Structures are given as C-alpha cells and as structure tokens.
C-alpha cells in the first residue's frame, strides 16, 4: 500500500507515462490464435483447461486472426500448410507475436531428416519470438513461453 500512496497525488490518481500504460496493456492481454496440430495441440488445450487456466494471465483465445495479436504454432508444419500459416500471420494486426511450440514446429521434430514434406521450423515461414521446446511440451512449458513473451514485450522501449 505504501508504494501506491507514494505514486498518487493528493487526488488519489496514479500518474504513469502513456508508453508504460500501453506496454502494460499489451503484455497483460495477449489474445492468441492457435494453429494446433497433433500432440502439441492436446497439451495446448490442457493449458487452457481449469487446472492451468491461461485466462488468469490475460490470455484469451480468439477465432479470427484479425482479433489476435499472438499466433501459437504447435505440431508438424508441412509445406502445404505454409501458405495458410503465412496468410493467417499477415491478417493479424500489428504488433503481432509468434510462439513456436514443440520440436516439430521449432525444427521439424523427428521428421526433419527423412520427411520431404516437413518444414524444418516455422521460422522459415514467419518470424518467431519465443520457442517452447519439448515433444510434446507440457502445459507448464507453454505458460513459461507466454511469460517469456510478456517479459519481451515489457522490455520493448517505444511505441512508434
């Protein structure tokens, strides 16, 4: 309570810079669109369930890329899917972020060596901000990736 009273004036209003307020709002309300494939998508659904409850972190899934600011790509990405992933990414408004979840999305997974149809990492299609390792990664790992993305947004300096 002492820290809040130090920031408020006599009127009880907290004074902050507009950039700090925008940064707080951006990192506290991440709205992802999920591109879930295979077993990583099951773990992602577990992260949204009541035991982990991503809503408490401000992470609310969206159905449209035009409403989302985070794309979570999980599972094996094939060359036929690459255009769809790029199209969804291009439809997202700025600022937009990408989380690559699981070994398959990160580097092609167990299929990278002999799979002619597998993209060797989603970062060859779209820029990736956070990589979540694992095969499949546990919901705790996805939550750790979301927290890492929030730290990355917090470290962003300006809104120009």
UniProtKB/Swiss-Prot annotation:
Belongs to the complex I 20 kDa subunit family. GO terms for molecular function: 4 iron, 4 sulfur cluster binding; iron ion binding; NADH dehydrogenase (ubiquinone) activity; NADH:ubiquinone reductase (non-electrogenic) activity; quinone binding. It catalyses: a quinone + NADH + 5 H(+)(in) = a quinol + NAD(+) + 4 H(+)(out). PANTHER family: NADH DEHYDROGENASE (PTHR11995), NADH DEHYDROGENASE [UBIQUINONE] IRON-SULFUR PROTEIN 7, MITOCHONDRIAL (PTHR11995:SF14). It is found in: Cell membrane. This is NADH-quinone oxidoreductase subunit B. Its EC number is 7.1.1.-. NDH-1 shuttles electrons from NADH, via FMN and iron-sulfur (Fe-S) centers, to quinones in the respiratory chain. The immediate electron acceptor for the enzyme in this species is believed to be a menaquinone. Couples the redox reaction to proton translocation (for every two electrons transferred, four hydrogen ions are translocated across the cytoplasmic membrane), and thus conserves the redox energy in a proton gradient. SUPFAM superfamilies: HydA/Nqo6-like. Keywords: 4Fe-4S, Cell membrane, Iron, Iron-sulfur, Membrane, Metal-binding, NAD, Quinone, Translocase, Transport. [4Fe-4S] cluster binds at residues 39-40, 104, 135. The keyword RNA-binding does not apply. The keyword Repeat does not apply. NDH-1 is composed of 14 different subunits. Subunits NuoB, C, D, E, F, and G constitute the peripheral sector of the complex. GO terms for biological process: aerobic respiration; electron transport coupled proton transport. GO terms for cellular component: plasma membrane; respiratory chain complex I.
């Amino acid at each position: 309570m002492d820290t809040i009273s130090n920031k408020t004036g006599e009127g009880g209003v907290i004074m902050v810079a507009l950039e700090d307020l925008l940064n707080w709002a951006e990192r506290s309300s991440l709205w992802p669109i999920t591109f879930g494939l295979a077993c990583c998508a099951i773990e992602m659904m577990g992260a949204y369930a009541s035991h982990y409850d991503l809503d408490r972190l401000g992470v609310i899934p969206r159905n449209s890329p035009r409403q989302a600011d985070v794309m979570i790509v999980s599972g094996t990405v094939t060359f036929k899917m690459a255009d769809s992933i790029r199209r969804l990414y291009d439809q997202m408004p700025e600022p937009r972020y990408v989380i690559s979840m699981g070994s398959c999305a990160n580097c092609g997974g167990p299929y990278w060596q002999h799979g002619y149809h597998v993209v060797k990492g989603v970062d060859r299609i779209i820029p990736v901000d956070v990589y979540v390792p694992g095969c499949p990664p546990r919901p705790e790992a996805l939550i750790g990736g979301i927290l890492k993305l929030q730290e990355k947004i917090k470290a962003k300096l300006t809104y120009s």
